[in-house]
Amino acid sequence: MNDSRYIGRFAPTPSGFLHFGSLVAALASWLDARAVNGRWLLRVEDTDPPREMPGARDAILQTLERYGLEWDGEVVFQSQRHPAYAQVVDRMFNMGLAYACTCSRKQLEGYNGIYPGFCRNAGHAREGAAIRLRVPELIYRFTDRVQGTFQQHLGREVGDFVIQRRDGLYAYQLAVVLDDAWQGVTDIVRGADLLDNTPRQLYLQELLGFSQPRYLHIPLIVQPDGHKLGKSYRSPPLEASQATPLLLRALRALGQEADPQLLTATPAEVLAVARQRWQPEAIAQRTTVPEADLY
């Protein structure tokens, strides 16, 4: 199959080094793009400087290169996109689609992450406040290529959500939607932990007149205690010397054929074979896969 219109992306955060869970996500999005001769973009989501680890940006790029996951075009850094985000936040605020919120974390305790609307009609000034987007009392639903139909009532299950924090930093939901549209992304392949973020992004896309990408949410790799592999749980960083065996293990996590004879192959050779054999329909329709099952 050949679809030169396909544009995918991998968007890591530089809060730490890439780990095995990152590799599975990167590999899935890379293969989905390359299998149809599409483009694969790299975007570093560095919108939260306090959480950024020194040296992580360069390490992420180097690791992807050593694992053979080459991207198209220039790397985009979200920290360079602030003027675009500011313009949209200003427009939404001035149109009454968003409002200033002065609620503290303590005030919101006990609401299970669902904003109760305390500041919705308060008319607070913007200075020193977060900016929340008003959400409709509607159900947003989409069909994921692996997980099937997913739906969420934005008003009841999320509430008005933050698009700019009180410290001035821009929220993930806003930045990801603006950047995917700006880069012309047609297909988003990412971890199932972001499945319930998607309806908020669909609403933003609708509000801003953007087309909706196709979505594919892969199972998360989890540790024995059920936590996903991640920087906050000190998952070991990827080592260049282990590229081939880890790529093969990542293929197994995605339900793909991982020929043991490729253990002596280079990362580029493993990827060339995997690209030809890519079958997204073989990915398990589940949200987690225990890491122990992959050995």
Curated annotation (Swiss-Prot):
It comes from the Bacteria. Gene3D superfamilies: Glutamyl-tRNA Synthetase, Domain 3 (3.90.800.10), HUPs (3.40.50.620). GO terms for molecular function: ATP binding; glutamate-tRNA ligase activity; zinc ion binding. Its cofactor is Zn(2+). A motif ('HIGH' region) lies at residues 12-22. Keywords: Aminoacyl-tRNA synthetase, ATP-binding, Ligase, Metal-binding, Nucleotide-binding, Zinc. InterPro entries: Glu-Q_tRNA(Asp)_Synthase, Glu/Gln-tRNA-synth, Glu/Gln-tRNA-synth_Ib_cat-dom, GluQ/Sye, Rossmann-like_a/b/a_fold. Zn(2+) binds at C101, C103, Y115, C119. Catalyzes the tRNA-independent activation of glutamate in presence of ATP and the subsequent transfer of glutamate onto a tRNA(Asp). Glutamate is transferred on the 2-amino-5-(4,5-dihydroxy-2-cyclopenten-1-yl) moiety of the queuosine in the wobble position of the QUC anticodon. This is Glutamyl-Q tRNA(Asp) synthetase. The gene is gluQ.
